[in-house]
């Protein structure tokens, strides 16, 4: 569904920036004095590649290093996402530097209604329109296109422009001239989402139009969109329609791929009902997730065929007649982690010895005039399951020659033409390529060495698959040398192979307690996580995390602050009418009106996190377990710490023990509250008729008896040596509770009990929120299952 920029001016740009056409800002842009083109990645002729052109506005000459750093971040985020990661070599990337006279852009909410003298005239509020949405960040389209036109060989038909504004305020717009604020936490995620539209022709999966308002029920016919449907799984399978080949698969972006079924994923095309998407969340619905397999297949097809051209870019000896003594060659593009298939035939009979070769010397084949030589170039990627897509010209090309008149002789010295660039480190699983010069009567030879040893993984030596070697951690030296079998010339290329995996060390908020013997933390109401992705190489390192296996999600800090940790709560946090950090059944992020239809995420979760470095290495995930339980904020009327001799009696108020060492029995009487954090109770605990009893990470020696409590009993991650009895306690849900109205019982989670446990008469029954207790004695009553 496409609408004009005016119609969409009030749309959420945190999630819908890519819907908007690149609108022309009313502001006058400055002349492009001092502009320069910086090629960042050139893997082929612009006519044979998809070209990404990055612009910057509001950066002074002195701020150009900042611009380059932010561009590095944007690109490395994009290259971490499939299929961009695997098809990176199908892209050329150019930076056009356009220094501005002043720093910043027009009408940035962080700086008031100020105008700035900039090269591209970028501005918030649709170019300082008071009636527009502040996040609608626009650019002077004439100036932006003029800047992009500076890139030789690149035209509007084979490029995507992304204009970055020097601002930390979130904003953006979309189309083939997309915009984003460069310093915001989420801005690096706009470019991949926008390419899904402009390159992949994919549609939005949002169930809303305005962030807090859906268009409601979808009433149209079966959508033309490749990733929206009205079909049930049964019908989709029967008709072999849409994404039937992916049904039931675990989604790369979380959950299970489904259709219009009771357990399907309802919502999309700005409607919340009666239209279904394949997965619970993908980047088409929520910034931060990957494409699911359905969207990834479409994107792979479109990237391979260079968008609307729909043709795999293959270079070759010109089709037609060739001599029986000639050599013919063909060269397709180079995926990063696999190779294209090259299948040669003569008069329909396959030449199995030549399988995978990009060149064929005819002299040894004893061919008669009129013989037909063909080669089929095909991408075997597992990202594509539809045989029609694989057989299309975008992924399969067949070239044919007939033996007849010889080619006009062409001599060439041994040398490399196109190759994997040597400036950037190679990943440990990459397929490195090196194309050579091509005389008409012979094929150059290429030899590879890895750390001084001769290696080979391909028929013709034009590629080396490093994934075959299971390289140990550290840097390695890879070289390729081309020689002429009939001459003395040669050339050598050398790469550094980075086989050191990156990591993403975590910093968690302080837990109420930690379960003994592992990375299992217990939290009241919420927790936060800061990742600090790191690597021994250069370039921006991407961090990712996922919760309960539900799809890897980009780590960006927090939507409002890239330096802040990511915050997890059972229902998420509303940030500008979108919800973030939800542990509930709907995933990490959703529209505000979706929260009520999902189960809140109280209880136990597994969080994994990892990093991806600029070379493309993916680090092994680390993980921890977090249990989130409800708990009221209690204001201490008295705080006790240090050593307490002779025991302790609590008769009124809220007495808090902060790391205290109580030597003697603790007694809590009617209406009083006891909150213990850490420390030790060396004499047991007896509470009768108390208001609240809460122990977190506490060591208790002696029996514990808690009965008749009127509001809360919570024992978290504590070590008890002695019998435990919980009887006739009433648990009143904390004001943070968002689960079922029936509430929850006394909380006994993640404790170690060296003694018997007996529970009876508690209302509701005792619960552990998924954090099992380690009990060595007998267990009876309501605690039997804990």
Q: Which residue stretches match the model-derived regions?
A:
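Secretory targeting and sorting signals
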Residues: 1-29
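Propeptide-to-catalytic entry region of secreted or membrane-anchored zinc metalloproteases
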Residues: 30-148, 182, 383
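Short pre-active-site segment immediately N-terminal to the catalytic Zn-binding motif
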Residues: 64-67, 171-192
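Catalytic Zn2+-binding segment of zinc metalloproteases
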Residues: 195-211
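Low-complexity, disordered linker/stalk regions enriched in Pro/Thr/Ser/Gly
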Residues: 318-330, 382-447, 453, 466-632
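Surface-exposed, flexible coil segments in extracellular/virion-facing regions
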Residues: 348-362, 452-466
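Extended beta-solenoid/beta-helix repeat architectures
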Residues: 630-786
């Amino acid at each position: 569904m496409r609408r004009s920029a005016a119609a969409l001016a009030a749309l959420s740009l945190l999630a819908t920036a890519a819907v908007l056409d690149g609108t022309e800002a009313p502001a006058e842009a400055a002349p492009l004095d001092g502009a320069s083109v910086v090629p960042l990645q050139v893997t082929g002729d612009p006519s044979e590649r998809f070209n990404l052109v990055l612009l910057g506005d509001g950066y002074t000459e002195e701020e150009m290093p900042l611009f380059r750093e932010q561009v590095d971040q944007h690109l490395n985020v994009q290259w971490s996402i499939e299929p961009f990661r695997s098809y990176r070599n199908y892209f050329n990337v150019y930076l056009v530097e356009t220094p501005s006279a002043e720093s910043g852009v027009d009408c940035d909410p962080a700086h008031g209604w100020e105008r700035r003298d900039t090269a591209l005239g970028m501005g918030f509020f649709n170019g300082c329109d008071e009636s527009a949405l502040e996040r609608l960040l626009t650019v002077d389209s004439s100036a932006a296109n003029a800047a992009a036109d500076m890139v030789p060989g690149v035209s509007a038909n084979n490029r995507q422009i992304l204009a970055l504004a020097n601002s930390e305020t979130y904003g953006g717009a979309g189309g083939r001239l997309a915009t984003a604020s460069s310093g915001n936490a989420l801005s690096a995620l706009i470019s991949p989402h926008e390419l899904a539209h402009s390159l992949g022709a994919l549609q939005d999966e949002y169930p809303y139009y305005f962030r807090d308002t859906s268009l409601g029920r979808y009433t149209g016919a079966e959508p033309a969109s490749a990733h929206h449907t009205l079909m049930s799984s049964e019908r989709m399978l029967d008709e072999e329609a849409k994404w039937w080949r992916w049904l039931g698969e675990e989604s790369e972006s979380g959950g299970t791929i489904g259709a219009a079924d009771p357990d399907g994923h309802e919502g999309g095309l700005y409607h919340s009902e009666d239209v279904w998407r394949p997965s619970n969340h993908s980047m088409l619905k929520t910034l931060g997730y990957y494409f699911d397999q359905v969207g990834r297949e479409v994107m792979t097809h479109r990237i391979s065929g260079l968008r609307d051209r729909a043709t795999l870019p293959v270079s070759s000896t010109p089709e037609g007649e060739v001599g029986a003594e000639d050599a013919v060659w063909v060269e397709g593009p180079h995926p990063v982690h696999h190779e294209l298939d090259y299948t040669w035939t003569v008069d329909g009979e396959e030449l199995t010895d030549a399988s995978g070769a990009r060149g064929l010397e005819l002299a040894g084949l004893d061919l008669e005039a009129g013989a037909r030589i063909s080669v089929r170039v095909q991408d075997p990627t597992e990202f594509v399951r539809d045989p029609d897509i694989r057989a299309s010209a975008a992924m399969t090309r067949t070239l044919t020659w007939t033996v007849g008149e010889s080619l006009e002789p062409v001599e060439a010295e041994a040398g490399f033409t196109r190759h994997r660039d040597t400036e950037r480190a190679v990943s440990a699983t990459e397929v490195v390529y090196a194309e050579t010069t091509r005389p008409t009567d012979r094929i150059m030879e290429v030899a590879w060495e890895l750390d001084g040893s001769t290696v080979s993984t391909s028929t013709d030596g034009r590629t080396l698959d490093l994934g075959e070697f299971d390289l140990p951690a550290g840097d390695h030296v890879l070289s390729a040398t081309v020689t002429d079998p009939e001459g003395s010339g040669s050339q050598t290329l050398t790469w550094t192979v980075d086989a050191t995996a990156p990591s993403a060390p975590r910093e968690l908020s302080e837990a109420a307690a930690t379960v003994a013997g592992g990375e299992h933390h217990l939290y009241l109401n919420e927790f936060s996580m800061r990742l600090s992705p790191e690597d021994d190489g250069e370039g921006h390192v991407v961090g990712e995390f996922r919760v309960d296996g539900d799809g890897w999600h980009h780590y960006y800090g927090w939507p409002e602050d890239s330096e802040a940790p990511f915050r997890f709560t059972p229902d998420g946090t509303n940030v500008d009418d979108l919800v973030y950090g939800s542990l509930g059944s709907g995933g990490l992020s959703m529209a505000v009106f979706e929260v009520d239809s999902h189960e809140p995420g109280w209880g136990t979760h597994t969080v994994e996190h990892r990093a991806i470095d600029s070379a493309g290495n993916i680090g092994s995930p680390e993980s921890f377990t977090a249990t989130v339980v409800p708990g009221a904020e209690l204001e201490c009327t008295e705080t006790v710490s240090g050593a307490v001799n002779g025991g302790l009696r609590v008769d009124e108020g809220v007495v808090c023990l902060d790391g205290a060492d109580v030597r003697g029995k603790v007694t809590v009487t009617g209406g009083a509250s006891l909150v213990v954090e850490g420390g030790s109770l060396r004499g047991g605990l007896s509470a009768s008729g108390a208001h609240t009893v809460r122990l977190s990470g506490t060591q208790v020696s002696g029996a514990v008896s808690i009965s008749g409590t009127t509001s809360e009993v919570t024992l978290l991650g504590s070590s008890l040596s002695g019998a435990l009895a919980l009887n006739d306690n009433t648990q009143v849900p904390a004001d943070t509770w968002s689960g079922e109205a029936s509430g929850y019982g006394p909380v006994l989670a993640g404790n170690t009990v060296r003694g018997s446990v007996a529970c009876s008469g508690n209302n509701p029954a005792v619960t552990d929120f998924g954090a099992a207790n380690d009990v060595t004695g007998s267990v009876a009553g309501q605690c039997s299952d804990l």
